[in-house]
Structures are given as C-alpha cells and as structure tokens.
Amino acid sequence: MIRADLATIPTYVPGRRLNNATKLSSNEVSFSPLPAAVDAVTEATQGANRYPDMGAVELREALAEHLEVEFDQVTVGCGSSALCQQLVQATCAQGDEVIFPWRSFEAYPIFAQVAGATPVAIPLTADQNHDLDAMAAAITDKTRLIFICNPNNPSGTTITQAQFDNFMEKVPNDVVVGLDEAYFEFNRADDTPVATEEIHRHDNVIGLRTFSKAYGLAGLRVGYAFGNAEIIAAMNKVAIPFAVNSAAQAAALASLNSADELMERVEETVEKRDAVVAALGTAPTQANFVWLPGEGAAELAAKLAEHGIVIRAFPEGARISVTNAEETDKLLRAWEAINAG
C-alpha cells in the first residue's frame, strides 16, 4: 500500500521546543513581523473565503523589481524549502543524481529521494565549508542538480567568488545549480557569489531565498526563486496549486516594501552574532547562528536546556541561533554557568 522505499527516507526533524524556554534551535528571528505586515495580514484575512491569487502576481511583480529581473524569471512558494523540492522535481527523474554539501540543509537528501533521485552528499572541508572541488568531481552523466547553500546551514560559512567561478567552469550547462541563500540578509562577506549576479552569468543557476528568516514570516511560509525563465516555468508546473495563501502573500509584499525597517532589525542580530562568536569562541559566521563542530552536541544541548535554552544538536556539532539582546544575554549567562561548573 505504501512505497517500499519510503522506509529508507529520513524524516525531516524540526528544531526542538520546550515550554517556557528560549528557542534558539530553528534560526528564527525573535521579533514579531513588521507592523505593515501585521496590518496586511489582518486585511487579507477578510477575504479568506476566496482562494488566493495562484500566480501571486502582485508579489512576483514586486520581487521582479526588487531583484531587477523579468516577471517570468521569479516565482514564489511555500517557503524556499518547497521551492528546493520543486527544483528537484522539475529537473530529476528516477535514477538521476542530486549533489549537495554535507552537513547542510537536511532536507536536500529527503527531497532527492522522494523524487526517486539519488542523493550524493559531499562532506564539508576541515574548515566546515563546501568542498567545491569534490562536488565538481562527483558530477556524472546522471547529475541533474547541485545545491550550494551560501551561507551554509549549519556551519555559517561562505564560499568565495573565485571558488564559485572555478566550480561553475566544471559544471555542464545542462546541470542546474540551486544557489540557496536563505540567510542572505545576514551575510556580510565581502568576497562571495550573489545569486542576483550569477543568474546573469549562468543560465543554469537558480537563486533561492526566503521570507522565513530575516523577514520574520516563518509561520506564514513564503519563499522565492529566480533565474532562467524556462526553469522557473518548470518549477511552477510541479508546484502545489494555491500553495502560498493570501495572508502570506500580503505579508511578504508589505515586508518587501519596508526594507529599511527590516534591515535595522537585521543589524541588531548581526551585532549580537559577533558578540556570541567572541564569547563562545566559534569560527566566524555569516548567518543568524553559530556552529560548534565536534562531538558532545547532545550533552551541550542538555546542559543548556537546564538553563532554559533550546539549541539544535547534530551528530557533527551544535547550532545555536542568534536573535536579540535579551535572548543573547540569557544564552551567554547560561554558557558562563556551564563552563564555570
């Protein structure tokens, strides 16, 4: 009755929650949606008896202007994760291959396997970054899609422009590269590729961004993809109808039009991020989290939970979200208490 291969597909595990605890496990922002977004949601719900605009025309028009692309070069989805899945479905058939770094966004292998494709995970380098040489070497005649997560989740590292340029020289034109920039707004790296530029250099690059992180709309689920219009059209073909509801579209549009206010909030997170990096002694990060590689993540998570802090433990290390001043102070007090004991 059920597909036999589903038994081999891992289940996506969200960040842990604890009642009355500070949740630093899902890379969410701590502030509420922008006031304009809240007002837009309130107004949009008045028409909740009607289906949303399936084409999200107004939002896509605004995004096209924001990204400086044509209307048919951008689409929206139920979070950038859904768009990642659509990209897999649009490019891969049974037995095709999807290459991605590991550890990275844990849904990549799930999306590949659900589509009947073969996930090809390439370990990160010793400094927790993409091994682009190894990823390029892994390309075969079955490769259809490559994900690059920049900044990478959970390590927070970024690749350089030269590294990406060298990598793209080795990627066949018929292999799509999904440049996942979910944490783009937090990225302060001077030397790194940016999808809005790369899509004009390479017809096989698709940019992926989200309103779930910096924009504070994780609960509404809106992401966007942009690039080659032919690939975007294929992604739309495999999308679930009416996937982005009216309230989500309205909130995303209002947030996009309040960029200055948004960036003030982002700068607070970046400031606190640098303080956490210094206090915990982690490597620099270009996202809204820090990464502590190595064993002992589960033990650290348990100790922080005793102090009312929830983080994300992976087999390879621990990821801790960075939010505002209040939650950062609580984290640092807990860290000091643990290390003093």
Swiss-Prot record:
Q: Which residues form a coiled coil?
A: none
UniProt keyword terms in alphabetical order:
Aminotransferase, Pyridoxal phosphate, Transferase
InterPro entries for this protein: Aminotrans_II_pyridoxalP_BS, Aminotransferase_I/II_large, ArAT, HisP_aminotrans, HistidinolP_aminotransfase, PyrdxlP-dep_Trfase, PyrdxlP-dep_Trfase_major, PyrdxlP-dep_Trfase_small
Q: From the UniProt record, give one GO term of the biological process aspect.
A: L-histidine biosynthetic process
Q: What are the recorded GO MF terms, alphabetically?
A: aromatic-amino-acid transaminase activity; histidinol-phosphate transaminase activity; pyridoxal phosphate binding
Its cofactor is:
pyridoxal 5'-phosphate
**HAMAP family reported in the protein's UniProt record:** HisC_aminotrans_2, Phe_aminotrans_2
Spell out the NCBIfam families in the cross-references: hisC, PRK03321.1
Q: Describe the task this protein carries out.
A: Aminotransferase that catalyzes the conversion of aromatic amino acids and 2-oxoglutarate into corresponding aromatic oxo acids and L-glutamate.
Protein name per the record: Aromatic amino acid aminotransferase
